[in-house]
Amino acid sequence: MEERININVSATNYDQSSDGIRSILTKLEEMVHEENEFVITDSEFAFGWHFYIVSVNKVLVEKLANQIGESFQKLKGKGLEKKFLTWFSQQTQEKNLKAKLAIKEEMESSKYGIF
């Protein structure tokens, strides 16, 4: 079974943010010669926000890390997932997407309370 990195996304505009995220990840797939390595779920709307999950195959992230090498290693965060989250957040900011990103497993840990 393939390992995936699941990222919680919170955004005020689902269509704009999911289209932007789809564009970022499609370009990433093209860059590392992969296809169909991510999934974006439908959103749940609450309190004026859309909440959804972006699931990315870890192979895609590993290939990104290998391709950009040292600059990936210099990204903030410990480990592959955190560094990818930093890279992904930078990409969304460059596209001016108004979205908050967090690793799903961390959101569910007791460190952040009980969910």
Show which residues each predicted segment covers.
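A structural detector for beta-sheet-dominated domains
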Residues: 8-12, 41, 55-57, 85, ...
